[in-house]
Amino acid sequence: MIDPRLPLTDIHRHLDGNIRAQTILDLGQQFNLNLPANELDTLRPHVQITKTEPDLVSFLQKLDWGVAVLGSLDACRRVAYENVEDAAHAGLHYAELRFSPFYMAMKHQLPITGVVEAVIDGIASGCRDFNIDIRLIGILSRTFGEQACLQELDSLLAHREGITALDLAGDELGFPGSLFRRHFNRARDAGLRITVHAGEAAGPESIWQAIRELGAERIGHGVKAVEDRKLMDYLAEHKIGIESCLTSNIQTSTVVSLATHPLATFLRHGIVASINTDDPAVQGIEIAHEYLVAAPAAGLTPHEIRQAQANGLEMAFISEQEKQALRDKVFPIS
């Protein structure tokens, strides 16, 4: 269930993993690209998960058509705006949208800084039109290597006022967090908050690395934390939140089934964990599905689902005053 008295949040939601199939079709035609299909129904299997993928990298390949059609900065602005519209229509009161400017720029060699500007502009327009609070998290795409990530970081820091936090995502096994220490040192020095994808494809050592070497305040996915009791204790004691993405973890074969997902274990251990989507358009789900279908299937009680909902706001990269303003907006006390 979703408690209507609490703000509904999604703090692990990829902007470049939530490009509508119709938009892919529209932009593909606009830029005269050879798409795998020219009709919406036949395009969907190429851009949306239809079966469990064998691993994370295979899952991520489903995102490629979404960014392949970004032939201009206006296209980037459009998908950013549509992401805000989708979040509002999903019933969210607050979301943190993360994006990799290098990944979005790569196919058509767009200026990376221009992509950051376009995304910030599209988000700002969407927030005005749809009355929702959205913050942006910049992603360093580890898959493209250290130099590409430096370019991303430079572009994100050039627009520091529009970026709330920094994330590291991509091929966790091939590109460990230790390669990106200097990137995250710079980000922290600039005042960015830190979240890191870890413990999804790699083991608990990747989570320790994210915390100790990159300064992670939150962990994306983090399912492998359950394999290390000391790590579980540390996460609970230091209130390092886990951004859980239930359906995604099944689709990437990170977890065998919802029944074996560790989210309930995290909550019962006192870890601040929340419920999120990940890549809604690619997954074919929205936040309501995660609360109403996935969370009960993962063994969460109604009380634990409510706790996870409250945790989403507690974990948010905004001030306590902003959190209280959201609470008051959703459930004003006369």
From Swiss-Prot:
Matching InterPro entries: A/AMP_deam_AS, A_deaminase, A_deaminase_dom, Ado/ade_deaminase, Metal_Hydrolase
Cofactor comment text: Binds 1 zinc ion per subunit.
A GO cellular component entry from the record: cytosol
A GO biological-process term: purine ribonucleoside monophosphate biosynthetic process
Cofactor annotation: Zn(2+)
Assigned EC number: 3.5.4.4
CDD domains, sorted: ADA
GO molecular function: 2'-deoxyadenosine deaminase activity; adenosine deaminase activity; zinc ion binding
Binding site for Zn(2+): H12, H14, H197, D278
Catalytic activity: adenosine + H2O + H(+) = inosine + NH4(+); 2'-deoxyadenosine + H2O + H(+) = 2'-deoxyinosine + NH4(+)
HAMAP family: A_deaminase
Homology family: Belongs to the metallo-dependent hydrolases superfamily. Adenosine and AMP deaminases family. Adenosine deaminase subfamily.
The protein, known as: Adenosine deaminase
